[in-house]
Amino acid sequence: VTPVSSAVAAIDQRVYFVEKPEKKKLLVSLLREEDKSVLVFSRTKHGADNISRLLSKSGIRSEAIHGNKSQNHRQRVLTDFKSGKIRVMVATDIAARGIDIRELEIVINYDLPDVPETYVHRIGRTGRAGHSGTALTFCTPDERPLMKDIQRLTGKKLNAETYRA
């Protein structure tokens, strides 16, 4: 068993094939169904801010962390997220490095990472220390080659759902 496949074995992984304009609706819909803390990954700083604004306007308490935010801001957001003061933390990959959140049940890949190994690091934020976890990934038509690379790396075919608003 490779370290990659063992790391992802305890995580329920699902992919949503979705058109780019529908991603926002899908995210809000999924977050309204769940009452748990969720870490959402965005590929860009700008995207993280946009997602956080969208969620806040939709009545879902969220904050974004990324490299343009101060260390104090990132620390406050992390503290608020861990305490449940905010339910959704939107992060870029670099900002999320080294973050340890116990019992995080759900990770959402709003954007697929450019590098398959980054996917493994992202979903590894959930399902830690014997807990189960869920990783939901949004995949637009232009991201399908990235999804194939991820499945090749993990050796796992993800449960797929097609989202239509």
Name each model feature, range by range.
Residues 1-165:
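Conserved helicase RecA-like core
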